């Protein structure tokens, strides 16, 4: 279903549910306009942004969950393709940025928890870890959240990260992409570039 991936050795991917602001975040990181919209699921194919002279790219993968105006079964197919993409290119993916809606994430996770069910976003977080891809959780739309620390602690807890969230600042990054407030994400991603001794990649998140 997904088209061919550009030939780049290193990559950072943006993953998450529909309508959490992945495309807006991609615009904030790259400084270039990318397709965004109010309807859930605007991005249906991976949106790759590469720098012509560099062996690196940033990829916005389609959101999973509710998509307006698509046939039944397509949503699950998108999720399967996202997982397949990450699995297939895990060796190239330096960081997997899991984008959450800070205001809605806890409710969505709790709604899909219980019994044998694992919420998609939690499943995706664990998948990144299992594949050896460093996860960074970009908690977006924080300008709409009143109880900031409590909300971030709850998100950390749902992901199996013992609160307080502040001790996980290399993993949890509160941001507001629409207002270009992404410094916490840049710091988190760059800390992993540091650990990998890839200072050459820090120019893309600064």
UniProtKB/Swiss-Prot annotation:
This is Probable GTP-binding protein EngB. PANTHER family: ENGB-TYPE G DOMAIN-CONTAINING PROTEIN, MSS1/TRME-RELATED GTP-BINDING PROTEIN. It holds the Pfam family MMR_HSR1. It comes from the Archaea. PROSITE patterns: G_ENGB. Residues 8-195 form the EngB-type G domain. It comes from Halobacterium salinarum (strain ATCC 700922 / JCM 11081 / NRC-1). The keyword Nucleotide-binding applies. CDD domains: YihA_EngB.
């Amino acid at each position: 279903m997904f088209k061919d991936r550009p030939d780049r050795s290193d990559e950072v991917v943006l993953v998450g549910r529909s309508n959490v602001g992945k495309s807006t975040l991609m615009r904030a990181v790259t400084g270039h306009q990318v397709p965004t919209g109010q309807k859930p699921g605007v991005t249906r194919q991976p949106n790759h942004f590469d720098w012509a002279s560099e062996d690196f790219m940033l990829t916005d993968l389609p959101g999973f969950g509710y998509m307006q105006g698509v046939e039944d079964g397509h949503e699950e197919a998108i999720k399967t393709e996202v997982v397949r993409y990450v699995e297939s290119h895990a060796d190239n993916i330096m960081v997997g940025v899991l984008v959450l809606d800070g205001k809605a994430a806890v409710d969505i996770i709790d709604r899909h928890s219980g019994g044998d069910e694992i919420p998609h976003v939690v499943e995706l977080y664990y998948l990144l870890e299992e594949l050896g891809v460093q996860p960074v959780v970009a908690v977006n739309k924080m300008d709409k959240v009143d109880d900031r620390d409590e909300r971030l602690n709850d998100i950390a807890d749902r992901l199996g990260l013992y609160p307080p969230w502040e001790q996980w600042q290399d993993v949890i990054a509160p941001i507001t992409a629409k207002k270009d407030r992404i410094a916490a994400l840049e710091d988190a991603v760059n800390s992993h570039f540091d650990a990998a001794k890839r200072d050459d990649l820090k120019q893309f998140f600064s």
